[in-house]
Amino acid sequence: MTEKTKEKHVLIFSAQWCGPCRQMKSSVLSDSKVKQRLSEYDSVQYLDIDEANGRQLSAAYRVSAVPTVIIVNEEGRHKKMGHFMNTYNFLEFLK
């Protein structure tokens, strides 16, 4: 992808107590290829399900496990992955 993806947003749900979330943050979300791919989206929100905003959005999107990553398009449709993903799987999910 060389141009910004039109009207797509990424929501990344996690929690401080979640081991796989911490692992994903330190190994996957810090990867330069992942950062580049995420920069192609209109927005990326990191949401803690134990905080008010994260709790509200996790209920709205029916998040039942963390980490969960959701991509929302301009029509409000979304795709969701609710488990730890390595760098390769995360990049594939973002396509």
Q: Each PLM stretch: what is its role?
A:
Residues 4-17:
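Short active-site neighborhood of thiol/selenol oxidoreductases, capturing the structured segment around
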Residues 18-22, 69:
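The canonical Cys-X-X-Cys-His
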Residues 59-64:
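A short glycine-leucine-enriched loop at secondary-structure breakpoints
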Residues 65-95:
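Non-catalytic, surface beta->alpha helical segment in thiol-disulfide oxidoreductase systems
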Residues 13, 34-54:
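Thiol-based oxidoreductase modules, predominantly thioredoxin-like and allied folds used
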Residues 22-37:
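Typically the conserved alpha-helix immediately C-terminal to a functionally engaged Cys/Sec
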